UniProtKB/Swiss-Prot annotation:
It comes from Halorubrum lacusprofundi (strain ATCC 49239 / DSM 5036 / JCM 8891 / ACAM 34). The lineage of its organism: Archaea, Methanobacteriati, Methanobacteriota, Stenosarchaea group, Halobacteria. One of its GO terms (molecular function) is metal ion binding. This is DNA primase small subunit PriS. One of its GO terms (biological process) is DNA replication, synthesis of primer. SUPFAM superfamilies: Prim-pol domain.
Length: 387
C-alpha cells in the first residue's frame, strides 16, 4: 500500500472513530486487547498484551490511533496486560465460532462474487444458530458480522466458560458431524414386552434425520411406483430389491416409518436411514473454523470497529434483526456516505455496496467514498490526487 493511500485510510478511520464508539464486551477489564496499526510496507504488526487500563479512555485511543484492525480476547485473565500468556492467569473464556466464506463448500474465492459469498455464509450462520440454540440450548449469544467475509458468534453462557480445548473440540465435532455414527442416532425402546429400534426424535442429529425420512417418504408417496423406485435407487446401497422392500414398508406400515422405526422394513429401511443421514450431515453442518473455537485464548474482532481489509463495520446484530440484516448495506459506515473521491485502479469490476452498483475501470475513477475505501482497503485501488 502506498503512502498516500495508507495515510488517507488512517485519517478516515480516525474520522469514523471520532463519531463512533466500539462496543465493549462484558468483563472488558479482564480481557487482553490488541490492534494492528497502519504501518508502512506490505506486512502488518500486531500490538497485543494490552489491558483496558493500558489503552486509557477507549474512545480517545481509537480516535487518536485509528487502528487498521482491533481485537479483544475471548478469555478473561487475572492480569490481561502481562507480557506472556503464562503470566496472565487464565480465568475463563467465551465459546467463539467463526464462519468464513473461504471455508464454505461450493464457494470458490476466485469465482464466487462477494455478495454471493456473504449470502452463502449467512445461510451457514443460520444453521450454526440452530445447533447452538436448539441442540445446546445456549441463550447468551452475540452474533457479529466480521466486516470481511463472514460472521462470529460469541457464546457467554456460564456453562461454557471453563471448557478446555478438548471439550470445545467436541462441540466443533458435533456441529460439523465429524465421525457421526448412524447407530448413535438410534435408541432401543420397549413397548408391551417387545423392543424396537427407533431414531432419536427429541432433538439433535437424530431429529434432523427423522425429519428428512418423513419428507422423503411423503415425496415418494406422491410419485408413481416406477418413479419412486428410481428415486430410491439413486441412493448408495439401494438396488431394485431394497427399493421394493422400502416401498412395501411405507405402504404396509406408514405409522411405524413416521415414528422413526428403523426396523419397519428390515435392512432396506435401515439402509435408507443411513443414506439420508449421510445426506443430512453433508447439507446441515456449519463449516466453522475449528482452531478459533478450540483456542481458549483467541483474539477476535471488536464489534463497532472497522475492518482494515474492507472498510466495513464489524457489526453486532440483534437476533431478531438477523433475517433482514444485509452486510452490504448495514455495515457501510455512515461516515463514508455522501461524498465522492478519486481513486486509481488496475482492475475492471463492479462493487455492490450501500444499494449501489459502482463500476470502476483501469485508470482514474470518481466513486462514492464507501466504494473507494472498500477497494483501497482490499488492495485493489490507490488514492488519487483530488486535483
Amino acid at each position: 500500500m502506498d503512502d498516500r493511500t495508507r495515510e488517507y485510510l488512517k485519517g478516515r478511520f480516525g474520522d469514523y472513530y471520532r463519531r463512533a464508539s466500539p462496543a465493549l464486551p462484558p468483563d472488558a477489564n479482564l480481557r487482553e486487547w490488541g490492534h494492528i496499526p497502519w504501518t508502512p510496507g506490505s506486512g502488518t504488526t500486531m500490538l497485543r498484551h494490552q489491558s483496558l487500563y493500558d489503552l486509557g479512555d477507549v474512545d480517545t485511543f481509537f480516535a487518536d490511533n485509528a487502528p487498521r484492525h482491533a481485537y479483544f480476547s475471548a478469555a478473561r485473565y487475572d492480569d490481561p496486560g502481562a507480557s506472556t500468556m503464562s503470566q496472565k492467569g487464565w480465568r475463563s473464556a467465551d465459546l467463539v465460532f467463526d464462519l468464513d466464506a473461504d471455508h464454505l463448500p461450493g464457494v470458490d474465492p476466485d469465482a464466487t462474487s462477494y455478495p454471493e459469498m456473504l449470502a452463502e455464509c449467512k445461510q451457514a450462520l443460520l444453521r450454526l444458530l440452530d445447533f447452538l440454540e436448539d441442540d445446546f440450548s445456549f441463550d447468551d449469544l452475540t452474533v457479529v458480522f466480521s466486516g470481511g467475509r463472514g460472521y462470529h458468534v460469541h457464546v457467554r453462557d456460564e456453562s461454557v466458560r471453563e471448557l478446555d480445548s478438548e471439550a470445545r473440540r467436541e462441540v466443533v465435532d458435533y456441529v460439523r458431524a465429524i465421525d457421526l455414527d448412524t447407530e448413535g442416532l438410534i435408541r432401543t425402546v420397549s413397548e408391551r414386552g417387545t423392543t424396537k429400534r427407533v431414531l432419536r426424535t427429541e432433538g439433535g442429529w437424530g431429529a434432523r434425520v427423522h425429519e428428512a425420512l418423513i419428507e422423503y417418504a411423503d415425496d415418494l408417496r406422491e410419485m408413481d411406483a416406477e418413479d419412486a423406485r428410481e428415486r430410491l435407487m439413486e441412493l448408495d446401497g439401494i438396488g431394485e430389491g431394497r427399493a421394493e422392500t422400502i416401498l412395501g414398508a411405507f405402504d404396509r406400515n406408514p405409522t411405524a416409518v413416521r415414528e422413526g422405526n428403523v426396523e419397519a422394513g428390515g435392512p432396506g429401511v435401515r439402509r435408507l436411514v443411513s443414506a439420508l443421514a449421510a445426506r443430512v450431515t453433508a447439507t446441515d453442518t456449519a463449516p466453522i473454523d475449528e482452531p478459533v473455537t478450540t483456542d481458549t485464548r483467541r483474539l477476535i474482532r471488536l464489534p463497532r470497529t472497522l475492518h482494515g481489509g474492507s472498510g466495513l463495520v464489524v457489526t453486532p446484530i440483534d437476533r431478531d434483526d438477523l433475517d433482514a440484516f444485509d452486510p452490504l448495506r448495514d455495515a457501510v459506515p455512515d461516515r463514508f456516505v455522501g461524498r465522492e473521491i478519486r481513486i486509481e485502479t488496475d482492475v475492471d469490476r463492479t462493487v455492490e455496496l450501500n444499494g449501489e452498483r459502482v463500476r470502476v475501470e483501469p485508470g482514474r475513477n470518481t466513486v462514492p467514498e464507501f466504494a473507494g475505501v472498500f477497494l483501497m482497503a482490499r488492495g485493489e485501488a490507490r488514492k488519487a490526487p483530488e486535483r
